[in-house]
Amino acid sequence: MMMTETVSLLSVPFGYGAGRHGSEMGPQAIFNAGLMRQLSELQIPVQDEGPLTVPQHYNSTHPRLKYFHEIIELNTNLAAKVSEIVARNSFPLVLGGDHSIAIGTYAGLAQHYKNLGVIWFDAHADLNTEDSSPSGNIHGMSLGVGLGRGPDLLTQIKGAGPNLKPENIVLIGTRQLDAGEKEYIRSSGIKCFTMHDIDRKGMSNVMDEAMSIVTRGTDGVHLSFDIDSLDPLEAPGTGTKIPGGVSYREAHFALELMYESRKITSAEFVEVNPSLDAGNKTARLTVELIASLLGQRIL
């Protein structure tokens, strides 16, 4: 395990932050793919926190941000629950849901970790703002909110932002960036390992560098893993597929190295969309990846 003994599973069946519906069914698909059986085989003590209550759909609108009020309510409640889990000295394992739930996850973590390292495994940087976002979908702004880039009502969720520091953040698997995101990454000091970097350096060297960055002067390390970081041939069940992603073995190897480091203190897996999947392939893959993070070995 990492720095705690018990894993607390928290399902967040929420998909309002994404451009298409279906990721709200992700947690159940992951459970249906055998998550509890896999964790039992690893002999890991698990506390199932059950699904977080998802807000009703409001009629209110925001001129640029879709489902703004629902996302505020959801992430406020999620932050409180994650904080409660950490206070019990348990390992929060959050299952999404779309990537907008990261806002609540790290808002809860920030109430306990004042210098949090973040590994953001994603095809995208999720650093857009309401002004730069082409779509208005908040799942593309979730990391930006933690850096104070975003509407006050989002960044001011208790602990939400700015509670992350650019120098403590590593992006891995990136292969689609909007112009404003490129500019911010270059100017802010965030370390970004694109697919080009992974191809050139290999995942072993990338992870060595990444772990060095996120553990330098930090008091905890959070993994935010978007399943669209993988190549769509491996993980078809996700809403924003970008060709040329992380391979099956590269992903497993990265998570195995994170386990070996014993430095990861929390994790979330997001953007599994069973309505776009092929026979629950992506959910099964997610179960396997979670197992690698928590100690599954070939031998």
What are these regions (language model features)?
Residues 4-14, 20-93, 105, 111, ...:
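Catalytic cores of soluble, metal-dependent hydrolases
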Residues 120-123, 147, 168, 173-176, ...:
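Short, structured patches in soluble enzyme cores that scaffold and shape functional sites
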